[in-house]
């Protein structure tokens, strides 16, 4: 048995509980501020993430290749330690974003609900989302444009493990 198996057996003697994505996270789609509004794109301070950021800088990100001004934001930026998941076009990629930010419309933000903040380690969720990536590829809507079936997406199951195991 592996060390992980030993920990699970020791700390979860009754088995591992699973929770659906929709119970653990609030979700919202990313967006692109209007390119016609020059002031949205000049002297920006809020990171705006695109697929290129993941490809160039990896899956745990604290800065973006492009920034937008606070005037470009609809409401508030998405909170730090959110996960972005590609749910259209290039499906099956994700990143942990460790700073307040926005991302383009290819991404769905997963923002952990307050009642689960102390129960999940952001890096554990990031690594577990590699399973979500594969699940997304199996849950596509039929049509001309590849996109994830969001009803199925919301049902994806995350294990509820003790922090000792997550870390």
Spans of features found by a protein language model:
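Short, structured motif recognition centered on aromatic/hydrophobic residues
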Residues: 16-24, 46, 81-84, 153
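Specificity-determining recognition surfaces
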Residues: 108, 127-158
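Sequence-specific dsDNA recognition surfaces
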Residues: 22-37, 52-80
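Non-catalytic DNA-recognition/assembly elements of restriction-modification systems
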Residues: 7-31, 163
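Short, recurring structural edge motifs at helix starts
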Residues: 5-13, 35-38, 95, 144-145, ...
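Amphipathic alpha-helical segments
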Residues: 15-17, 121, 154-167
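Short, compositionally biased
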Residues: 96-109
């Amino acid at each position: 048995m592996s060390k992980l198996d030993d920990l699970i057996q020791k700390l979860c003697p009754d088995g591992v509980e699973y929770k659906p994505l929709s119970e653990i996270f609030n979700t919202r789609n990313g967006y692109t501020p209007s390119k016609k509004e020059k002031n949205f794109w000049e002297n920006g301070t809020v990171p705006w993430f695109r697929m290129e950021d993941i490809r160039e800088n990896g899956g745990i990100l604290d800065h973006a290749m492009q920034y937008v001004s606070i005037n470009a934001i609809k409401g508030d930026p998405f909170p730090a330690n959110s996960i972005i998941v590609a749910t259209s076009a290039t499906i099956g990629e994700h990143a942990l974003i460790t700073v307040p930010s926005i991302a383009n419309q290819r991404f769905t933000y997963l923002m952990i609900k307050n009642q689960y903040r102390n129960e999940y380690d952001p890096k554990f969720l990031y690594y577990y989302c590699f399973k979500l990536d594969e699940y997304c590829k199996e849950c596509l809507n039929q049509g001309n444009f590849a996109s994830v079936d969001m009803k199925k997406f919301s049902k994806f199951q995350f294990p509820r493990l003790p922090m000792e195991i997550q870390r």
